[in-house]
Regions:
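C-terminal helix-and-tail extensions that cap enzymatic domains
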Residues: 1-15, 23-24, 28-35, 62-191
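Mobile cap/lid helix-loop segments that gate and shape the active-site cleft of serine hydrolases
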Residues: 38-63
Length: 191
């Protein structure tokens, strides 16, 4: 289905050869995607992993339900103005499921900082500037508080990579695991 949809989208944009697709500008590809989405042929999220039976045998949801995903701590999150406003509900459901399967925790976050400048939103992936401390590479007028948030987030992600806990060795830190009995989402924003 993904290949058929991709071909249909490229054909409609006049990009019928591999050479034409490679030569297309990002703006042309974005316009082709927008025009294809406007046809209403796609329901739900169009940019999801393609389950082809070779590289990916099942969806993440199926693998989680079957308990065939890695038995490790997980950190999952979204942004305040994400394209899927119900993302948090899915994260809570995943955390509740994992709680029945393993003792490893799930940590949930929501990035709430609406970026300065235009667009003034916490759009999908806007937390990446902070996670990787690349604020200085952006055209946006970030403040000292933004740099403090980036430092805090870098500490959380580094601790999670090292210890499986964003609080590091302090297992009783401020970022609690997301559980069925005690749902918890760390809201990341400037103070």
């Amino acid at each position: 289905v993904a290949e058929i949809m991709g071909k249909e989208m490229m054909d409609a944009a006049g990009l019928t050869t591999l050479e034409a697709m490679r030569a297309a500008t990002p703006e042309q590809l974005d316009a082709a995607f927008g025009a294809f989405m406007a046809t209403g042929k796609v329901q739900g999220l169009p940019l999801v992993p393609h389950i082809d039976g070779r590289l990916l045998g099942k969806s993440f949801t199926e693998a989680a339900t079957d308990n065939t995903i890695a038995d490790v701590p997980y950190m999952l999150g979204s942004t305040l103005d994400d394209m899927m406003p119900t993302m948090g509900e899915g994260i809570d459901a995943f955390a509740a499921l994992r709680e029945t399967q393993t003792k490893n925790p799930v940590y949930a976050y929501r990035f709430d900082r609406r970026l300065p400048g235009e667009p003034n939103t916490a759009y999908h992936s806007s937390e990446l500037w902070f996670m990787f401390k690349t604020l200085k590479n952006s055209r946006r007028p970030f403040t000292a508080a933004d740099y403090e948030l980036a430092d805090r987030m870098m500490d959380y992600w580094t601790n999670f990579a090292k210890f499986g806990n964003p609080n590091g060795n302090n297992v009783d830190g401020e970022w609690k695991p997301d559980t069925k009995e005690n749902p918890f989402t760390m809201h990341l924003d400037i103070k």
